[in-house]
Amino acid sequence: MLSLKTLLCTLLTVSSVIANPVPARDPSSIQFVHEENKKRYYDYDNGALGEPIRGVNIGGWLVLEPYITPSLFEAFRTNDNNDDGIPVDEYHYCQYLGNDLAKSRLQSHWSTFYQEQDFANIASQGFNLVRIPIGYWAFATLDNDPYVTGLQESYLDQAIGWARNNSLKVWVDLHGAAGSQNGFDNSGLRDSYEFLEDSNLAVTTKALNYILKKYSAEEYLDTVIGIELINEPLGPVLDMDKMKNDYLLPAYEYLRNTIESNQIIIMHDAFQQFNYWDDFMTETDGYWGVTIDHHHYQVFDSSQLESSMDEHIQVACQWGTGVLDEAHWTVCGEFAAALTDCTKWVNSVGFGARYDGSWVNGDETSTYIGSCANNDDITSWSDQRKENTRRYVEAQLDAFEMRGGWIIWCYKTESSLEWDVQRLMYNGLFPQPLTDRQYPNQCNTTSS
């Protein structure tokens, strides 16, 4: 999940290929199948699964996000008037505590925030996949990194086992790069954009290659059906040519030519417009098993927050139609039920909310749209707000199922309502079963 989407407007265009890619193999349990002008689907068991990806993100677990687990960060609070002294990300969390204390607190968090029962619940609720974010620092670090390292991998392995036990599939998502790929707090290091600096790129590539080699091995392919090369690279501020040529293409070559794996790779769209990636790593150029991951929110810009409900629905449906003619198989790997940015720290520590006019980020401010009071208390929600939230969720599900499916952000939080699938389901704001529709055909589609 991100917080600075108003920056995202620039487009770059480039096309390049590597020599002699490994040819596509026959369809198997890790190949995508498609027919012209039809939705692509995942072939889990040497036959069509018959449904799109319907997944949840395991957010705030192996990569900290203050709004998901605020108690970890509230421990640093020194006054009630502002967030001064509270670390803004995992980098500073570990730096402030020192390695030993950070390790103790993080191990406690990793051991308790998710349990196998959560994965059993996810499966029983009809989901078929979990996307698990993890940072580069779990596998490799820079010399001066304060991160706790080397321990997250065992928790990831445990989670993959939980998924297997409950017939869930997994995307392993490299969520944070050395130097940060986007400057968001969820990259591990806020306000930095140095991912493509040579030493940072080398460490990130080392971590990625480890992930690719391990989780593309035969023992994992029954469960791990995709590896995301990097989450949300901020294309408008990065050198896209360098990212493609020095990171994405080498990753593909390493996967196909060095370790000779037919694992699926996931590429985030880098906040580029639909069809931007249509001439990069395409089937016609000999590439295969490449998926584009789009992320969609409507709460990180004041104009979006001011939209009418019909406008929100229209935009959501356009997210679905926008990918119908994209060259790659596509999934919406992040979206949410949220229609406000009221959840504390969802915009990052210290920034406030645009919705109630408390947003301050340098010279940027916002004007009042509505109150954020009691935002996480469902008893304070009007019937209209509940209806709007359910409408918005259903429209997004229908839109994303026009192609490969969806993975909602995220399964649970400590206290948020708008960002917590468990709470949304409990309060009837997220469909159960997942195909149930109180507001059918909002995108002129039919419910399955």
Swiss-Prot record:
This protein's UniProt keywords: Cell wall biogenesis/degradation, Disulfide bond, Glycosidase, Hydrolase, Secreted, Signal, Zymogen
Reaction catalysis annotation: Successive hydrolysis of beta-D-glucose units from the non-reducing ends of (1->3)-beta-D-glucans, releasing alpha-glucose
Signal peptide: 1-19
Maturation-removed propeptide residues: 20-40
An annotated GO BP: cell wall organization
An example molecular function term from Gene Ontology annotations: glucan exo-1,3-beta-glucosidase activity
Described function: Beta-glucanases participate in the metabolism of beta-glucan, the main structural component of the cell wall. It could also function biosynthetically as a transglycosylase.
Family listed: Belongs to the glycosyl hydrolase 5 (cellulase A) family.
Entry protein name: Glucan 1,3-beta-glucosidase
Source organism per UniProt: Saccharomyces uvarum (strain ATCC 76518 / CBS 7001 / CLIB 283 / NBRC 10550 / MCYC 623 / NCYC 2669 / NRRL Y-11845) (Yeast)
Gene it is expressed from: EXG1
